[in-house]
């Protein structure tokens, strides 16, 4: 009996219907960007210092410039105005309203040396050096409360983790289209509610809800488009779907620049989700899923609709459907299957580490850029541009060179770029940006490679389980990354880059221990997967020479 792939060969593997559907789902992919990396703009932390009652009035009376006001009233500023923990989180215990204070050096009358003046934590809020607003400036997520910004982003990734597993199961149980529309609706409503949140706690709840459904919706969109196209187009369409995410990065930078208020920015990036609800009339259910649920009549109706859209017709001989998988006895996948045999166990551990590393470096580099960059909008835009050549490199090398070497090199390039950035002087900003973009391109290639190779190393009956379990480390990485970046920068601004360099270089080395999958059929059994080892040419040649030598003697 024919499969969906057999029918698509006759009615079009990537014709008008698939192109229209891809365009619609690509919009969904781009709209996921603000949730995944929006913390750069929503959680932007500008320079700040304690608000002290009476300072503004004294500054106005004395006619100080902003720089003079900071120099006279803020502790811990360096000679060039460098910020520190003291300047941002501590204040002089001085009554600035007293009339005896001098305009030239107001603290000289209180102590011969400023370092002898008592300090105390900020009690009256902060003054932020920015014309816009972020969740940091509105809810004062600085100093003793800075961990609350880490929690904000980590909770999104907790939602990613739970939603990808739970909603992924529901999509297999109740259908792709239904779950896609539900995730879009919840994402849209919770996004609007977050924009009007009265306090930090409610904002946290609604952001978690967005995380719970948004990544799951992105994954369902990925599954849908790959199930609508023919076998020969799946990999290319999958890469292009991720390129749409990159386009979303570029658009996000422009929207964030135009809307420096975080609430308006949140509204702007959320409202398009309501338009995606129109997909109810534009995108049908996956015929492959319908067949797997023994709903062949509905599947054939959709297939005929696709054929009509493509200007084709379904041959009568192909109108009896069967699932792509064998309908005989099926093995039940088990988590133990991922670690029971030596080669698969090695694959599982290396892939889990690489998923974790890809997430930490990808999100971490973006977050660090928001802290260290001079212009976060331009830096974000430039670093997003390098994801286009990253996708081109993958398409160019994956079937020519293979998976293993480009993947290993990309990890090592990302790690080396992070390490090099530590030693580049601040006055060579152009070089810092160039090296940062190189690192971003490297980790982008690694991220997309691990998505592909993960499915190619496991036998059929545990393939989905293996991808699910290994990729869950991606969300674990996303949970720890905010704490890693924001806390380590409190110690030293470049400290996170050193950590990124180490984990990236280790990941590249571990990839070389995996077998090459280029040109190899997908393993069907445990035995097939266990035999996917690199050819040991040198050892075989040595044995051959020893045999010939023995024959001659």
From Swiss-Prot:
Cytoplasmic-side positions: 1-21, 172-177, 232-238, 285-348, 397-404, 454-464, 516-553
Membrane topology: Multi-pass membrane protein
BP term (GO), one: xenobiotic transport across blood-brain barrier
Tissue: Expressed in kidney and ureter. To a lower extent, also expressed in brain and embryo.
Keywords from the named record: Cell membrane, Glycoprotein, Ion transport, Membrane, Phosphoprotein, Transmembrane, Transmembrane helix, Transport
Motif Proline-rich sequence mapped to chain: 284-288
Gene Ontology terms for molecular function: acetylcholine transmembrane transporter activity; amine transmembrane transporter activity; choline transmembrane transporter activity; efflux transmembrane transporter activity; L-arginine transmembrane transporter activity; monoamine transmembrane transporter activity; neurotransmitter transmembrane transporter activity; organic anion transmembrane transporter activity
Site annotation Involved in recognition of organic cations and participates in structural changes that occur during translocation of organic cations: residues: 451
The reaction(s) this protein catalyses: (R)-noradrenaline(out) = (R)-noradrenaline(in); (R)-adrenaline(out) = (R)-adrenaline(in); serotonin(out) = serotonin(in); dopamine(out) = dopamine(in)
Extracellular side: 43-150, 199-210, 260-263, 370-375, 426-432, 486-494
Protein activity control: Tyrosine phosphorylation of the transporter leads to activation of the transport activity. TEA uptake is activated by tyrosine phosphorylation. Inhibited by cGMP, most likely through a cGMP-binding protein that interacts with OCT2.
Protein family per UniProt: Belongs to the major facilitator (TC 2.A.1) superfamily. Organic cation transporter (TC 2.A.1.19) family.
NCBIfam families in UniProt: 2A0119
Function of the molecule: Electrogenic voltage-dependent transporter that mediates the transport of a variety of organic cations such as endogenous bioactive amines, cationic drugs and xenobiotics. Functions as a Na(+)-independent, bidirectional uniporter. Cation cellular uptake or release is driven by the electrochemical potential, i.e. membrane potential and concentration gradient. However, may also engage electroneutral cation exchange when saturating concentrations of cation substrates are reached.
Name the record gives this protein: Solute carrier family 22 member 2
Species annotation: Mus musculus
């Amino acid at each position: 009996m024919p499969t969906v792939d057999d029918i698509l060969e006759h009615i079009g593997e990537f014709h008008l219907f698939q192109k229209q559907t891809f365009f619609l789902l690509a919009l969904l992919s781009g709209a996921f960007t603000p949730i995944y990396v929006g913390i750069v703009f929503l959680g932007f932390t500008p320079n700040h210092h304690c608000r002290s009652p009476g300072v503004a009035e004294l500054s106005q009376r004395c006619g100080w410039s902003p720089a003079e006001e900071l120099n006279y009233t803020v502790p811990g500023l360096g000679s060039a105005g460098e910020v520190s923990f003291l300047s941002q989180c501590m204040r002089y215990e001085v009554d600035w309203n007293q009339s005896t204070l001098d305009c030239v050096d107001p603290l000289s009358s209180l102590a011969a040396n400023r370092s002898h003046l008592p300090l105390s934590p900020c009690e009256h809020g902060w003054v932020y050096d920015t014309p816009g607003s972020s969740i940091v400036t509105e809810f004062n997520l600085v100093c003793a409360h800075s961990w609350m910004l880490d929690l904000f982003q980590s909770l999104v990734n907790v939602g990613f983790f739970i939603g990808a597993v739970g909603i992924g199961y529901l999509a297999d149980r109740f259908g792709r289209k239904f779950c896609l529309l539900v995730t879009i609706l919840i994402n849209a409503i919770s996004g609007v509610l977050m924009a009007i949140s009265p306090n930090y706690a409610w904002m946290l709840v609604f952001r978690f809800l967005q995380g719970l459904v948004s990544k799951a919706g992105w994954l369902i969109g990925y599954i849908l488009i790959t199930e609508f196209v023919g076998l020969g187009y799946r990999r290319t369409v999958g890469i292009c779907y991720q390129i749409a995410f990159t386009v979303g990065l570029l658009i996000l930078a422009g929207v964030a620049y135009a809307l420096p208020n975080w609430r308006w920015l949140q509204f702007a990036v959320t409202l398009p989700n309501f338009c995606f609800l129109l997909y109810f009339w534009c995108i049908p259910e996956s015929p492959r899923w319908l067949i797997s649920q023994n709903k062949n009549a509905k599947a054939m109706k959709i297939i005929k609709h696709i054929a009509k859209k493509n200007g084709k017709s379904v041959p009568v001989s192909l109108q009896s459907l069967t699932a792509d998988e064998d309908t005989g006895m099926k093995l039940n996948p088990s988590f133990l299957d991922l670690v029971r045999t030596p080669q698969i166990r090695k694959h599982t551990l290396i892939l889990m580490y690489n998923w974790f590393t890809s997430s930490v470096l990808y999100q971490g580099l973006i977050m660090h850029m928001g802290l260290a960059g001079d212009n976060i909008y331009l830096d974000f835009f430039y670093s997003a541009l390098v994801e286009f050549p990253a996708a081109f490199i993958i398409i160019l090398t994956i079937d020519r060179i293979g998976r293993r070497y480009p993947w290993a090199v990309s990890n090592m390039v990302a790690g080396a770029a992070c390490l090099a950035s530590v030693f580049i002087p601040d006055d060579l900003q152009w070089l810092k940006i160039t090296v940062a973009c190189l690192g971003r391109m490297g980790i982008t290639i690694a991220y997309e490679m691990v998505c592909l190779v993960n499915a190619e190393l496991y036998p059929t009956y545990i393939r989905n389980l293996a991808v699910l379990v290994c990729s869950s480390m991606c969300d674990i990485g996303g949970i720890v990354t905010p704490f890693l970046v924001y806390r380590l920068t409190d110690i030293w601004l470049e400290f996170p880059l050193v950590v990124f360099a180490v984990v990236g270089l280790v990941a590249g080395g571990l990839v070389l221990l995996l077998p090459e999958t280029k040109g190899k059929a997908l393993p069907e059994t445990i035995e097939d997967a266990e035999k996917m080892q690199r050819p040991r040419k040198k050892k075989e040649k040595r044995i051959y020479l020893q045999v010939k030598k023995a024959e001659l003697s």
